[in-house]
C-alpha cells in the first residue's frame, strides 16, 4: 500500500516478526529444486513449494523474502530474495500462461522496487509484452490457460496479473500496458459476476467475443462462490480503481468485499474453501483466500472515505491468521508460514 508507514501495523498485533524471518530462512536450500526448469520427482521427506519455475506460485517465495527484507532490513533476507528471484529469469521468455503476471511481479517487481537494476527492469518489460501477446482485442480479454476444453478461457484469477501491466506502464511511460489491463477488467466486470456480485471461476469466450460457457475448475460447482476466487476479485478491482479512478471498479471492489464479509460462515472469519461449501468441522478452510482478502481490504480502506469497516475486517483476518490455529511454529509445517490453505480441492 502506498504510504504504508502511515497505517497501523496490524500485522504485528500478535504477530512475531522474528518467527517470520527464522521460518523464511530455515534451510531454504531445500526449495532450490522447485525453481529448476525440470525439477526432480518428489521424494519422501523433502519439500517443494511449486512444481517448477513455470508454476503459477513460483514467484511467491522470492516475494516473501523481499517483503521480509523491506520490513526488517536483514541483509540475509535480501541475499536470499536476489538468489531465488534470479532462478526465475527464464520466465521472462515464457508466453504459455497469464500467470507470468504475478510470477514475475512478485519476484522481479519487488526486486526492482527494492534493488533496482536495468536487467530487472528489462525482464519486467519483456514479461509484460508477453502477457499482452495473450490479449485478444475482439474478445477484450487476456487468455488465461492454453489447456482444457475451453475455446478462450478467462479465469477470475487473471485480475491478479494486471498489476504487472500497471507497473510496467509506469516504468516505461507507455499506456498500452495499462489500456490492455483496464479493457480486461471491463470485460471481466461485464461477464464474470452474478447479480449478488459473486464471481464465476471460468468464463470462456467464442472467437467473436460472445460467451461460450461459465463454469468452475476449482470451486464446489459451476454456480458456487469459490473463496479464493472472490479474494482475487476484490484485490484486482481495488488495484484497477487505484490505477484508473474509475468508480465502476471501486463499486465492484466494495460489492465483492460486502459479499465476503456477509457470507463468511466461520467465527474467526477465515472462509471455508468455497462460500457454498457445507458448514461442518470437516470442510477445509482457505487461509490463502483470507490472506489475499486482508491485503485487498487494507488497500481498499485507504481509497474510500468509509474505509474503516474494511480495515477492521482485514485486521480481524490478520489476527486470526496470526493465531496458533493458523500460524505455524518455527520448524514445523515444512517451513511454510500458514496452515490450512486449500489449493484446488476438486482436482
Where are these regions (language model features)?
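Glycan-recognition and catalytic cores of secretory/periplasmic carbohydrate-active enzymes
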Residues: 1-347
Amino acid at each position: 500500500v502506498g504510504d504504508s508507514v502511515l497505517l497501523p501495523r496490524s500485522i504485528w498485533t500478535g504477530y512475531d516478526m522474528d518467527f517470520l524471518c527464522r521460518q523464511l530462512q530455515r534451510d531454504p536450500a531445500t526449495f532450490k529444486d522447485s525453481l529448476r526448469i525440470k525439477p526432480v520427482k518428489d521424494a519422501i521427506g523433502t519439500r517443494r513449494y511449486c512444481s517448477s519455475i513455470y508454476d503459477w506460485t513460483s514467484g511467491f517465495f522470492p516475494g516473501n523474502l523481499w517483503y521480509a527484507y523491506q520490513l526488517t532490513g536483514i541483509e540475509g533476507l535480501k541475499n536470499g530474495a536476489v538468489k531465488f528471484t534470479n532462478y526465475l529469469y527464464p520466465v521472462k521468455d515464457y508466453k504459455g500462461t497469464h500467470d507470468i503476471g504475478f510470477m514475475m511481479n512478485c519476484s522481479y517487481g519487488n526486486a526492482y522496487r527494492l534493488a533496482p537494476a536495468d536487467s530487472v527492469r528489462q525482464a519486467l518489460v519483456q514479461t509484460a509484452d508477453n502477457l499482452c501477446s495473450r490479449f485478444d482485442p475482439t474478445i477484450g480479454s487476456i487468455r488465461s490457460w492454453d489447456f482444457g476444453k475451453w475455446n478462450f478461457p478467462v479465469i477470475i484469477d487473471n485480475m491478479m496479473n494486471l498489476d504487472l501491466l500497471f507497473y510496467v506502464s509506469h516504468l516505461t511511460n507507455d499506456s498500452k500496458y495499462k489500456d490492455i489491463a483496464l479493457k480486461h477488467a471491463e470485460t471481466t466486470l461485464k461477464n464474470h459476476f452474478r447479480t449478488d456480485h459473486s464471481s464465476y471461476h471460468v468464463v470462456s469466450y467464442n472467437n467473436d467475443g460472445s460467451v461460450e460457457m461459465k463454469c468452475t475448475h476449482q470451486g464446489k460447482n459451476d454456480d458456487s462462490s469459490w473463496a479464493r476466487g472472490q479474494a482475487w476479485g476484490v484485490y484486482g478491482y481495488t488495484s484497477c480503481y487505484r490505477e484508473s479512478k474509475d468508480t465502476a471498479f471501486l463499486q465492484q471492489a466494495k460489492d465483492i468485499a460486502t459479499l465476503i464479509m456477509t457470507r463468511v460462515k466461520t467465527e474467526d472469519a477465515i472462509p471455508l474453501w468455497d462460500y457454498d461449501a457445507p458448514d461442518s468441522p470437516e470442510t477445509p478452510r482457505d487461509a490463502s483466500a483470507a490472506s489475499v482478502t486482508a491485503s485487498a481490504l487494507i488497500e481498499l480502506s485507504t481509497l474510500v472515505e468509509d474505509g474503516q469497516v474494511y480495515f477492521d475486517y482485514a485486521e480481524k483476518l490478520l489476527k486470526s491468521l496470526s493465531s496458533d490455529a493458523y500460524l505455524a511454529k518455527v520448524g514445523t509445517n515444512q517451513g511454510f508460514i500458514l496452515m490450512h490453505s486449500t489449493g484446488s480441492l476438486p482436482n
